[in-house]
Amino acid sequence: MSEIQNKAETAAQDVQQKLEETKESLQNKGQEVKEQAEASIDNLKNEATPEAEQVKKEEQNIADGVEQKKTEAANKVEETKKQASAAVSEKKETKKEGGFLKKLNRKIASIFN
């Protein structure tokens, strides 16, 4: 029985050793995969960062252009309002002057008639 026990214990020790080796191997492989993944992520970030910055600059330029166009449009609207107001005032003044001149002409005509 002792020989069978020895063989069983030896087999158990062999299995235990193989399990430990497998565990260590898996841990090493896991660490390698993790490091490769981190390196890949870093590479992707490094590649994407300049492109993202360029896109951000372009978006800012577009936003600045839109803001400038809005300001220009608002200024044109204000200028148009001022011109319209001036035209209305001028028309009113002209109408008043025209009415005054008509009355004056009538008075002059009545004096000479």
Curated annotation (Swiss-Prot):
<dbReference type="GO" id="GO:0031505">
    <property type="term" value="P:fungal-type cell wall organization"/>
</dbReference>
<feature type="modified residue" description="Phosphoserine">
    <location>
        <position position="25"/>
    </location>
</feature>
<keyword id="KW-1003">Cell membrane</keyword>
<feature type="compositionally biased region" description="Basic and acidic residues">
    <location>
        <begin position="17"/>
        <end position="37"/>
    </location>
</feature>
<protein>
    <recommendedName>
        <fullName>Protein ZEO1</fullName>
    </recommendedName>
</protein>
<keyword id="KW-0175">Coiled coil</keyword>
<keyword id="KW-0472">Membrane</keyword>
<dbReference type="GO" id="GO:0005741">
    <property type="term" value="C:mitochondrial outer membrane"/>
</dbReference>
<feature type="cross-link" description="Glycyl lysine isopeptide (Lys-Gly) (interchain with G-Cter in ubiquitin)">
    <location>
        <position position="29"/>
    </location>
</feature>
<feature type="modified residue" description="N-acetylserine">
    <location>
        <position position="2"/>
    </location>
</feature>
<feature type="compositionally biased region" description="Basic and acidic residues">
    <location>
        <begin position="53"/>
        <end position="82"/>
    </location>
</feature>
<feature type="cross-link" description="Glycyl lysine isopeptide (Lys-Gly) (interchain with G-Cter in ubiquitin)">
    <location>
        <position position="57"/>
    </location>
</feature>
<keyword id="KW-0007">Acetylation</keyword>
<feature type="compositionally biased region" description="Polar residues">
    <location>
        <begin position="1"/>
        <end position="16"/>
    </location>
</feature>
<keyword id="KW-0832">Ubl conjugation</keyword>
<keyword id="KW-0597">Phosphoprotein</keyword>
<feature type="cross-link" description="Glycyl lysine isopeptide (Lys-Gly) (interchain with G-Cter in ubiquitin)">
    <location>
        <position position="18"/>
    </location>
</feature>
<feature type="cross-link" description="Glycyl lysine isopeptide (Lys-Gly) (interchain with G-Cter in ubiquitin)">
    <location>
        <position position="45"/>
    </location>
</feature>
<feature type="coiled-coil region">
    <location>
        <begin position="2"/>
        <end position="97"/>
    </location>
</feature>
<feature type="modified residue" description="Phosphothreonine">
    <location>
        <position position="49"/>
    </location>
</feature>
<feature type="cross-link" description="Glycyl lysine isopeptide (Lys-Gly) (interchain with G-Cter in ubiquitin)">
    <location>
        <position position="23"/>
    </location>
</feature>
<feature type="modified residue" description="Phosphoserine">
    <location>
        <position position="2"/>
    </location>
</feature>
<comment type="subunit">
    <text>Interacts with MID2.</text>
</comment>
<dbReference type="GO" id="GO:0005739">
    <property type="term" value="C:mitochondrion"/>
</dbReference>
<feature type="cross-link" description="Glycyl lysine isopeptide (Lys-Gly) (interchain with G-Cter in ubiquitin)">
    <location>
        <position position="34"/>
    </location>
</feature>
<feature type="modified residue" description="Phosphoserine">
    <location>
        <position position="40"/>
    </location>
</feature>
<comment type="function">
    <text>Acts antagonistically to MID2 in signaling cell wall stress to the PKC1-MPK1 cell integrity pathway.</text>
</comment>
<feature type="cross-link" description="Glycyl lysine isopeptide (Lys-Gly) (interchain with G-Cter in ubiquitin)">
    <location>
        <position position="82"/>
    </location>
</feature>
<dbReference type="GO" id="GO:0005886">
    <property type="term" value="C:plasma membrane"/>
</dbReference>
<keyword id="KW-1017">Isopeptide bond</keyword>
<feature type="region of interest" description="Disordered">
    <location>
        <begin position="1"/>
        <end position="96"/>
    </location>
</feature>
